[in-house]
Amino acid sequence: MEDAYFMDEALALAREAAADGEVPVGCAIVRGDTIVGRGRNRRETDKSALAHAEIEAIGEACRRLGGWRLWECTLYVTLEPCPMCAGAIINARIPRVVYGASDRKCGAVDSVCSLFSMEFNHHPQVESGVREAECGALLTEFFRNLRMELRSRPRWKPGSNT
C-alpha cells in the first residue's frame, strides 16, 4: 500500500483529536500492510505533556507486537515529530518515518534540528510532505478557531474580581 493511504489513517486520528479540542496530530504505525499502533494527541485530555500521538502509537505497537523494538515498522504522523517523539522513535528502532506537515517551532527531524542525523545508534529513513497540504490545513484551521475563541472570551484585568 502507498504512504498516502496510511497518512489518511493518521489524518483521521488527527481529526478525532481536533474534535476533542486537542491539537490535531495523528499517528499510525504499520508493519507490512497492517496498522499495529494508533495514536492521537491527548495532552489536554490526559493533562500530560507526554500524551503525544507518536508516544501513544509506539506504546500500542510495542504491546501488540510483544516487544519494544519496532524494526519492521513505518511510523506515519501528520506533524513533524518533536524532540521527545523523535527520541522515542530512535529508541524503538523504527526504521522509517513519514510525516505530513513541517513544524517550524518544534520539529526535531528537519525543521529546528535533526535528531535522526546525530550520532545515535539508530537513524530512521525520513519521507516528508506526504499529504502536507491536508495536514497543514487541519492545523491552521484548528489554531485559527482557537484564536477566535480566545478573543471572544472576556479578559481578566488586574484589580478586578471577575
Regions found by a protein language model. Give the residues of each.
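Zinc-dependent deaminase
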Residues: M1-A17, M84, A88-T162
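Short, basic and Ser/Thr-rich N-terminal targeting/leader segments
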Residues: G21-V25, R69-W71
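Short beta-strand scaffold segments in enzyme catalytic cores
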Residues: V25-D33
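Short secondary-structure boundary/capping segments
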Residues: C27, G66-G67, F116-M118
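A short acidic/small-residue loop/turn micro-motif
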Residues: R43-T45
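Helix-adjacent hinge/juxtasegments
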Residues: L50, I55, G59-A92, R96
